[in-house]
């Protein structure tokens, strides 16, 4: 843990992501109530809880798909509470989704190349050979980072489910993100695929922080340094993975039948 603390300290003191008193109402229903979270640059955190705890609504507020009813959201010190999603993407925020959004009729390489091109600041200079070469180099590097080099010329529709999830991570890494939201990346994966997912996430560049929502608690606790537990739209517990795993109240809520 000392090495983790040293790494986080070296990345700066300004919070990567800071939520203060975030509440989200749907009519009379409070999906989120007074959520306050601070995530440091390079920090890897899990947000866990049963279905209906508010995890996905939290992600939607961070990405700008939902605007908070009250409270503020800051990204690397900048107030982005009212920013649309594309402005947050421009500032280095990325997200994966529970449901894949891939081009099934294109190859792995084409999917990653298009993602790199879409977030490239030089996207209007594609005819310049230097720009095209740089994008292709980025494409190959990302494919290698998610262990898909051997299938880079295959159609995405031909990939195994686990490989498609790996491809989604590559797309999220396009354009040098500063922070990523992973929405259940282990969903539907076999034990072997989950082990590979853990390898990919733990090997991400140290400056990239992330929050992971995950129903597989074993996977989540292996790839993070801190955990936030949610229940009924509120923060229930926070702590290190070993503290959360051994907490009696968490065991009762999450492992004793409150988790699907």
Which residue ranges define each predicted feature?
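Glycine-rich phosphate-binding loops of nucleotide-dependent enzymes
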Residues: 2-260
């Amino acid at each position: 843990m000392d090495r983790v603390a040293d790494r986080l300290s070296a990345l700066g003191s300004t919070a990567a992501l800071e939520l203060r008193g975030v509440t989200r109402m749907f009519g009379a229903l409070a999906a989120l109530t007074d959520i306050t979270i601070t995530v440091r640059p390079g920090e890897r955190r899990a947000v866990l809880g049963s279905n209906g705890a508010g995890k996905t609504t939290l992600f939607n507020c961070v990405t700008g798909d939902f605007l908070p009813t009250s409270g503020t959201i800051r990204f690397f010190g900048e107030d982005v509470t009212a920013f649309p999603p594309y402005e947050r993407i421009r500032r280095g925020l990325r997200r994966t989704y529970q449901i894949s959004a891939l081009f099934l009729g294109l190859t792995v390489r084409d999917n990653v190349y298009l993602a790199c091109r879409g977030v490239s600041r030089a996207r209007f200079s594609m005819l310049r050979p230097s720009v095209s070469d740089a994008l292709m180099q980025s494409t190959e590097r990302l494919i290698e980072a998610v262990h898909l080099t051997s299938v880079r010329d295959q159609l995405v529709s031909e990939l195994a489910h686990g490989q498609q999830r790996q491809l989604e991570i590559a797309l999220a890494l396009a354009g040098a993100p500063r922070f990523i939201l992973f929405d259940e990346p282990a969903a539907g994966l076999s034990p072997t695929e989950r082990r590979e997912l853990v390898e990919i996430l733990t090997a991400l560049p140290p400056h990239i922080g992330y929050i992971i929502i995950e129903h597989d608690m074993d996977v989540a606790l292996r790839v993070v340094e801190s955990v936030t537990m949610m229940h009924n739209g509120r923060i229930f517990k926070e702590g290190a993975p070993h503290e959360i795993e051994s907490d009696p109240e968490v065991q009762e809520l999450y492992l004793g039948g409150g988790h699907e």
